[in-house]
Swiss-Prot record:
PANTHER family: DIPHTHINE METHYL ESTER SYNTHASE, DIPHTHINE SYNTHASE
Protein name: Diphthine synthase
InterPro entries, per database record: 4pyrrol_Mease, 4pyrrol_Methylase_sf, 4pyrrole_Mease_sub1, 4pyrrole_Mease_sub2, Dphthn_synthase
Organism: Methanocorpusculum labreanum (strain ATCC 43576 / DSM 4855 / Z)
Lineage of the organism: Archaea, Methanobacteriati, Methanobacteriota, Stenosarchaea group, Methanomicrobia
SUBUNIT field: Homodimer.
Gene Ontology BP annotations: methylation; protein histidyl modification to diphthamide
Alphabetically ordered keywords of this record: Methyltransferase, S-adenosyl-L-methionine, Transferase
Cytoplasm found in the keyword field: no
Gene3D superfamilies documented for this protein: Cobalt-precorrin-4 Transmethylase, Domain 1 (3.40.1010.10), Methyltransferase, Cobalt-precorrin-4 Transmethylase, Domain 2 (3.30.950.10)
Protein residues bound to S-adenosyl-L-methionine: L9, D85, V88, S113, I114, L165, A204, H229
Length: 252
């Protein structure tokens, strides 16, 4: 059996009761650490809370060397833990398909997801979001333009854009909102586009999340504090959305 369990957004206390029961009864516990991380709970705290040894998994462990996971699930009870909700990342869907190819039973226990948490924190209506996009760290001469293309297409349809910021867990490197805004502004400059407003969110799901809305210069000057950070590029605001951002995100 392979059970996919979403752990929620911030620390060890965000897992559901059903998820916790499944972890405690598992023979093998894997934790995927490359699409997102629980910043409020290092792996040692998770192990202490669950009473289980946890094997961390990086991208190649899941996408290339998944047999270790599948073997554990074929011959025992394995759980595959992720921050947020398990099936938001395509790579996790692929793992479930490969398990089915080997006739391994699978099940999903959902957790809170950043894709819905940002709506509560920002007040932006979830049905008004278009395609999401990720901003990676540039590498050498590689400077992808996909983010501004997606944002521009969404704005044309009057849709908000959720912008994920790069995570390099193996290097303990987490993109900041100020870095992402710099990259997006450079992309916008290259295609003669404009981004009039951003909403930045830090540490969603924690006891003290930070939310701030403003233009590029305001966002780069604002101190969002420690990671994880995420961005939204809003379309034209509904009056309720605007009032929410004014009250809870410092929008002027």
């Amino acid at each position: 059996m392979l059970t996919f369990i979403g752990l929620g957004l911030f620390d060890e206390y965000d897992v559901s009761v059903r998820g916790l029961d499944a972890i405690k009864s598992a023979d093998t516990v894997f934790l995927e650490v490359y699409t997102s991380v629980l910043m409020g709970a290092p792996i040692e705290r998770l192990e202490a809370f669950y009473g289980k040894k946890i094997t961390p998994l990086y991208r190649e462990d899941v996408e290339i060397h998944a047999d270790k996971i599948l073997d554990a699930a074929e011959f025992g009870n394995a759980v595959f833990l992720t921050a947020g909700d398990s099936m938001v990342a395509t790579t996790h869907s692929d793992l479930r398909i490969r398990a089915a190819d080997r006739n391994i039973p699978t099940t999903i226990i959902h957790g809170a997801s950043i894709t819905t948490a940002v709506c509560g924190l920002s007040g932006l209506q979830n049905y008004r979001f278009g395609k999401s996009v990720s901003v990676p760290f540039p590498y050498g001469k590689w400077f992808p333009m996909t983010p501004i293309e997606v944002i521009s297409a969404n704005l044309k349809e009057n849709l908000h854009t959720l912008v994920f910021l790069d995570i390099q867990k193996d290097k303990e490197r987490y993109m900041k909102i100020s870095e992402a805004v710099d990259l997006l502004e450079e992309q916008a400059r290259r295609v003669d586009a404009g981004i009039p407003l951003y909403v930045g969110i830090a540490r969603a799901g924690s006891p003290e999340p930070t939310v701030h809305a403003g233009n590029a210069e305001e966002m780069k000057a604002f101190d969002f504090g420690s990671p994880l950070h995420i961005l939204i590029v809003p379309a034209t605001l509904h009056e309720i959305e605007r009032e929410y951002l004014e009250r809870f995100a410092g929008l002027c």
